[in-house]
Amino acid sequence: MKKLLLILLCLLTGCAATYDGPTTVEPRLTEYTLDQYYVFLDGEVDHDVKRTVYAYDIHGNRVREMDYSDDRLFSVTKMRFDDRGNMIESITWDHSGWLPKFSRRVTKTFDDQNRLLTQDYYDFWGRKTSSSTYTYDDQERTRTWCSDDGDSQITWYDEQDNELRQVAGEYETVYEYDDRGNMTGWQSFEQGKPTDSYRARYDDRDRIIWGGRYDPAGELESETTYTYDDALGTKSYDTYDGGRTVEHYHADGRLHMIEDFDADGRLVFLHRYYYQDIQVPVKEGTS
């Protein structure tokens, strides 16, 4: 009986494999909830709750996501990984009807440097609906993405793997960084002519404190100021629609709550993140 229960537990959590090497304890996100609030014309307030539960295998890979809406199971996604931790397959089942049904499958392949090579999508009938391929030039430090419908994009990187430039057809974006690796801005072009641009500033702890978006004439269209409260562990900023967002962090930097307020100061969205410590293999090169 105990053996049967163990088998069932492994099937549910994706932990059928075994691992006998050294392990350590790391926090993993195990549950996420979203409360959405509605205010009616008569002033009455209502809200619904969406929840996602995550499960991991003994290697620390996220192998299952279960989505709930008002405590009713909505969808289940199962992931499969190779022995290097790359997610090579994702299958989603829709549980919103009377019977669960397959809704989407994604497969991926990687090279020996764990770089994505192909990504294929399949529909309910198992037919491939779209496909993408990625090629790399280590000497030129580029990555080229091509879709099966003829679209393509090439990206250039620096030695720290920061994106320097992207070209997709007649569109181009150029990125800038400071000497600490913070992205300080980007400039977009269409057919060689400047379009939108963005600029950012950071504090001495590499935290963004201001970001501004500019129109093609160089006029400031919108800006966001970020403030931090180290005692409370919060990061706050205004949103484009006049609202305000407050992010809450644990002492170790893990995000545990986000509050989104509208222009009238009413709470609209409440995001909460829950973690559990799980045993995972010790990464190579660490003790």
Predicted regions, residues:
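C-terminal motif of bacterial Sec signal peptides marking the signal peptidase cleavage site
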Residues: 12-14
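Sec-dependent N-terminal signal peptides
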Residues: 6-9
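Buried hydrophobic residues that stabilize the cores of well-folded domains
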Residues: 18-287
